[in-house]
């Protein structure tokens, strides 16, 4: 991808250089034609055009590299962009979900967590059990 952009930049540079050399040559038109019909670039305009092309190319390349770096390293990137319903993709998605579960902070909820379990006093907690055993 970058090679195509680089080749396009080199072609544009070559065309600008050719235009600069042809502007110094004798005009191919006759003197009867008006000067407004000629479309030639001065050296200043050619330099400005070349500068604009180079700046645009560098900006596009840097944005593309940032986008690739962000997408390539992200675990949250959607799996649908990479593949769909393949066993390796399903395993990859499951491993990502497992990784997310392992890295998220734990919350103190559930049956095995420490903390206040009941608000009943100890003497009243097992009172009903004693009555049921005495009846047997």
Swiss-Prot record:
Its main location: secreted. GO terms for molecular function: calcitonin receptor binding; hormone activity. Disulfide bonds join 83-89. It comes from the Eukaryota. Keywords: Amidation, Cleavage on pair of basic residues, Disulfide bond, Hormone, Pharmaceutical, Secreted, Signal. The modification Proline amide is found at residue 114. GO terms for cellular component: extracellular space. Residues 26-80, 119-136 form a propeptide. Residues 1-25 form the signal peptide. Causes a rapid but short-lived drop in the level of calcium and phosphate in blood by promoting the incorporation of those ions in the bones. This is Calcitonin-1. It comes from Oncorhynchus keta. The lineage of its organism: Eukaryota, Metazoa, Chordata, Craniata, Vertebrata.
């Amino acid at each position: 991808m970058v090679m195509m952009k680089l080749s396009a930049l080199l072609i544009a540079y070559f065309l600008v250089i050719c235009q600069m050399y042809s502007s110094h040559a004798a005009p191919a038109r006759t003197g009867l034609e008006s000067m407004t019909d000629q479309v030639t670039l001065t050296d200043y305009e050619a330099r400005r055009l070349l500068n604009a092309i180079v700046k645009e190319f560098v900006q596009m390349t840097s944005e593309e590299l940032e986008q690739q770096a962000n997408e390539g390293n992200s675990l949250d990137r959607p799996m649908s962009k990479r593949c769909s319903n393949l066993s390796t993709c399903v395993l990859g998605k499951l491993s990502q979900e497992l990784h997310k579960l392992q890295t998220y902070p734990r919350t103190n909820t559930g049956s095995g967590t420490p903390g206040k379990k009941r608000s009943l006093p100890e003497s009243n907690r097992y009172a009903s059990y004693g009555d049921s055993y005495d009846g047997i």
